[in-house]
């Protein structure tokens, strides 16, 4: 998981813990937290997180020994971290599903990286997001994608509503934080369960009835 610009990983704690309760090992890098982050370096750190899990899975003395499904990695992130998770997924075939939150354009371009991704993509966005508007970010990423893709837009959802608390330069929405986080967790869990656990009962939860 990649954090947003100038945000602490701890502001996503409840969502990361939610995923853990559904059987996922969740790892989040706290790098590139300053005012001049390098997005490619952030993507590289996301990939290093996967390598760390692989290494721990192979060490007999590790608490993770033999516990990690190293062929079933998913990637996620919020804002800058969402964009960097796109870069990481486009560059690392170990990632089998991508689901991010209000992903922001990056340098190098996350939008331009979308055609290189060949795994399922979920671009969760908020209709009231004034920091990373869905029309110029999530929609552009969706349009550029050639993979199975979905763009769930949380009505009334806002940029900082994906976090446990407001951080630097936050906006506001028309739904509560609790409502937005509940819907975010529902979407994330259903998507990852479908594509990483192959739980076909989640098909309609992700794609609807058609």
Enumerate the predicted regions with their spans:
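The conserved beta1-alpha1 loop
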Residues: 1-4, 102, 125-126
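Short substrate-entry loop that stabilizes the transition state in hydrolases
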Residues: 1-38, 130-133
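Gly/Ser-rich "nucleophile elbow"/oxyanion-hole loop immediately N-terminal to the catalytic nucleophile
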Residues: 38-83, 201
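A conserved short beta-strand
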Residues: 94-105
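Short beta-strand/loop motif that positions the catalytic acidic residue
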Residues: 117, 123-125, 129
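Acidic catalytic loop of the alpha/beta-hydrolase fold
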Residues: 128-132, 159-160
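Short alpha-helix in the alpha/beta-hydrolase fold that links the catalytic acid
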Residues: 132-143
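Alpha/beta-hydrolase-fold serine-hydrolase catalytic core, especially in secreted/extracellular enzymes
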Residues: 147, 156-158, 164-210
